[in-house]
């Protein structure tokens, strides 16, 4: 039974951050029903030699400290990305720092990488690993605000998580840590990602045991910026790119009273921009690097559009705020129906269909 429609009218009684905390506690206590719908074979897909039960994942940000990975997987996600985690604990930016744009089905945040640090994060991942629990889990790593040499923090994050996560993401695109997005420039990204890859490879000399390393970039990159990202990732042998993070732009269509808040905008207002940038990136990499499409997904049609624009996998987060966890099985069912209706036998067959 989907209880979210009964709960949602009471959400305005809490700040968005309080409501998020309540959702984490509810998931910990098993109060959120699991997805019992049968798996549809058309949604199975293989990326980086990993077999995903479906391509619909949870983006980083919901479970920053890897506390509720298994309850989240039980909602029907094909994979869950925990983080962003910083090497040392930090509180992030002052509150309030999270705003619901109800009229727009969007969210603005300026968290600033609030994190308990790597120690509890890898403890949680280690417990899962030791127990042999199923499910595909990514680790999204970032930098502490006060760190001058960003590479040091990404090396620390990659080194600590590479034996415990199924894939790793270097987040260089949050708009809420000063100077972070400058790391997307060609020279800076080449140095940082090169160091991160070396850290992974040094930690795991056997290439067969290494988790894929991805980079998460901003949808605000212009064509020259995208070209730089594509060139650097191809040159270095990065395994994948997530397009994209939140945007600092503000569409004219926004109606919420919170539309002027500083921070990154996510949710429905981000869909058009992030999907266009995804397609532009796909034209540059042409299947040589798998892409993950994120930004504004709230339906099976949205997920399908991302796949047709070049995404091998997709991620969502903000839509859960407005539609609740029952959205996940609805997206999967609709996506499967759309793939079959268009004659695709698999997700992989549809990747980039609108860009070819």
UniProtKB/Swiss-Prot annotation:
InterPro entries: Aldolase_TIM, DHO_dehydrogenase, Dihydroorotate_DH_2, Dihydroorotate_DH_cat, Dihydroorotate_DH_CS. FMN binds at residues 60-64, 84, 140, 171, 216, 244, 267, 296, 317-318. Its main location: membrane. GO terms for molecular function: dihydroorotate dehydrogenase (quinone) activity. It catalyses: (S)-dihydroorotate + a quinone = orotate + a quinol. Pathway: Pyrimidine metabolism; UMP biosynthesis via de novo pathway; orotate from (S)-dihydroorotate (quinone route): step 1/1. GO terms for cellular component: cytoplasm; plasma membrane. Belongs to the dihydroorotate dehydrogenase family. Type 2 subfamily. This is Dihydroorotate dehydrogenase (quinone). It comes from Azorhizobium caulinodans (strain ATCC 43989 / DSM 5975 / JCM 20966 / LMG 6465 / NBRC 14845 / NCIMB 13405 / ORS 571).
């Amino acid at each position: 039974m989907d209880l979210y429609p009964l709960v949602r009218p009471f959400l305005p009684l809490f700040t968005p951050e309080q409501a998020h905390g309540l959702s984490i506690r509810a998931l910990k206590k098993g109060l959120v029903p699991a997805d019992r719908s049968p798996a549809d074979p058309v949604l199975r897909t293989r990326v980086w030699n990993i077999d995903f039960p479906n391509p619909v994942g949870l983006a980083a940000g919901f479970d920053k400290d890897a506390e509720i990975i298994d309850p989240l997987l039980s909602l029907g996600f094909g994979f869950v990305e925990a983080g962003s985690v910083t090497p040392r604990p930090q509180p992030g930016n002052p509150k309030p720092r999270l705003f619901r744009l109800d009229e727009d089905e969007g969210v603005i945040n300026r968290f600033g990488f609030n994190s308990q640090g790597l120690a509890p994060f890898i403890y949680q991942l280690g417990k899962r690993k030791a127990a042999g629990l199923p499910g595909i889990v990514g680790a999204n790593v970032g930098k502490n605000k006060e760190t001058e040499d960003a590479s040091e923090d990404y090396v620390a994050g990659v080194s600590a998580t590479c034996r415990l996560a199924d894939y790793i993401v270097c987040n260089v695109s949050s708009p809420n840590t000063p100077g972070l997005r400058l790391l997307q420039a060609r020279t800076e990204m080449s140095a940082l990602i090169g160091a991160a890859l070396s850290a992974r490879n040094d930690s795991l000399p056997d290439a067969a045991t290494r988790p894929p390393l991805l980079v998460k970039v901003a949808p605000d990159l212009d064509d020259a910026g995208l070209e730089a990202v594509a060139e650097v990732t191809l040159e270095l042998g990065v395994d994948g790119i997530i397009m994209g993070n939140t945007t600092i732009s503000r569409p004219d269509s926004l109606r919420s009273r919170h539309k002027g808040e500083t921070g990154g905008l996510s949710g429905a207002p981000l869909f058009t921009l992030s999907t266009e940038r995804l397609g532009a990136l796909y034209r540059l990499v042409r299947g040589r690097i798998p892409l993950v499409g994120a930004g504004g997904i709230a339906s099976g049609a949205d997920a399908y559009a991302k796949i047709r624009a070049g995404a091998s996998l997709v991620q969502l987060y903000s839509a859960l705020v407005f539609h609740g966890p029952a959205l996940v099985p609805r997206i999967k069912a609709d996506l499967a129906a759309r793939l079959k209706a268009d004659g695709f036998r698999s997700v992989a067959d549809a990747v980039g269909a609108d860009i070819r």
